[in-house]
């Protein structure tokens, strides 16, 4: 009897998709959002307008559609990413609505910032679903690395010749709305950084001289770092956008360090940025004013210190447990719904509530870094780590700015601050991170291989003749 050999296919034990848990957490996020809205209405209007419950239903329906897209196109996505972002977005909508109520009482006009933000949430979730549908594999982005980099640079350069608005050249005005192209540049440039670092890794890891225990790069290999430095300083000087400059440069240094594991790149980068910032401080008036406001906002109230002072007063008023949703005085803070929304939460939720919000961001960042660790390809590792690090850096810049830990930069808080460009760009960022997460958690199917004939041969009894 002849035994036919069968190929053996080994399959990695599948992880549970956890899609039902994600749906349950989305419901929980919707309940918290509606409850926060009810508290604001009770404290501000002394009643609850029941039609607002419809907004809660619309809100949950939006994210349920995003959940269905994940279930259909990326079922192994980390189940915590979407619910946490939904909760952050929902709380941001509640606070923007709360600020609308204050503005209505003060000015007598009907403000609709919350409705506009809800519309941008719809656009952002639609973009999330579109990316999840179209982008079947995150490695496809590596093919367009140079195109992404060029497009990102164009987006950065477009506002430079346009008129200055609110102290910076970062906006492009259209009839009825405006966009901030730098929000999309950070994603495009991260794709470019990751693609180049994977394709040209030898350029960044070539050994140079040794100094104080560090391996320095060769002088001719410093061109990419110098290019990033020139771009960052140019944005800071010519567009007066310190936040984007700091965010892009710090993200580049993080990705370079993760790709090379050489501290020398980071140290050289920090030295270059410090030198450029110092020269800019003594050369350009707006940089000098920004630093003076940071050093002593109380004596520079007329040139930007007033809003920082009011932010500090809000944190002091909130204390440990806050004044309660709807019981604060956010109208005292200029740009409360954009640059200073963290200060508003700090006043009404206190240190405990603000720490909880920061913990939600921390979970998203940590899950993004875990995705980077679990991803099997180098491009996915660098891109996921870069996206997660960008969120962490942006959160640090925003939080540090409103507490005077660092100079105020004008960046917005992801998913919470008012602004369509920021919301849309961060949902695209989330979709890419979710796609990489699906790839990292998806069971790995190995190639079939033939087993040894000895292993499958049956035992035969041979009679002695």
UniProtKB/Swiss-Prot annotation:
Its EC number is 2.4.99.28. The keyword Cell inner membrane applies. Pathway: Cell wall biogenesis; peptidoglycan biosynthesis. Pfam families: FTSW_RODA_SPOVE. It is found in: Cell inner membrane. It is an enzyme of class 2 (transferase). GO terms for biological process: cell division; cell wall organization; peptidoglycan biosynthetic process; regulation of cell shape. PROSITE patterns: FTSW_RODA_SPOVE (PS00428). The chain crosses the membrane at residues 21-41, 50-70, 76-96, 115-135, 144-164, 179-199, 222-242, 243-263, 264-284, 308-328, 340-360, 382-402, 414-434. It catalyses: [GlcNAc-(1->4)-Mur2Ac(oyl-L-Ala-gamma-D-Glu-L-Lys-D-Ala-D-Ala)](n)-di-trans,octa-cis-undecaprenyl diphosphate + beta-D-GlcNAc-(1->4)-Mur2Ac(oyl-L-Ala-gamma-D-Glu-L-Lys-D-Ala-D-Ala)-di-trans,octa-cis-undecaprenyl diphosphate = [GlcNAc-(1->4)-Mur2Ac(oyl-L-Ala-gamma-D-Glu-L-Lys-D-Ala-D-Ala)](n+1)-di-trans,octa-cis-undecaprenyl diphosphate + di-trans,octa-cis-undecaprenyl diphosphate + H(+). Belongs to the SEDS family. Transglycosylase involved in peptidoglycan cell wall formation. Required for the regulation of cell length. This is Peptidoglycan glycosyltransferase RodA. It comes from Mycobacterium leprae (strain TN). The gene is rodA.
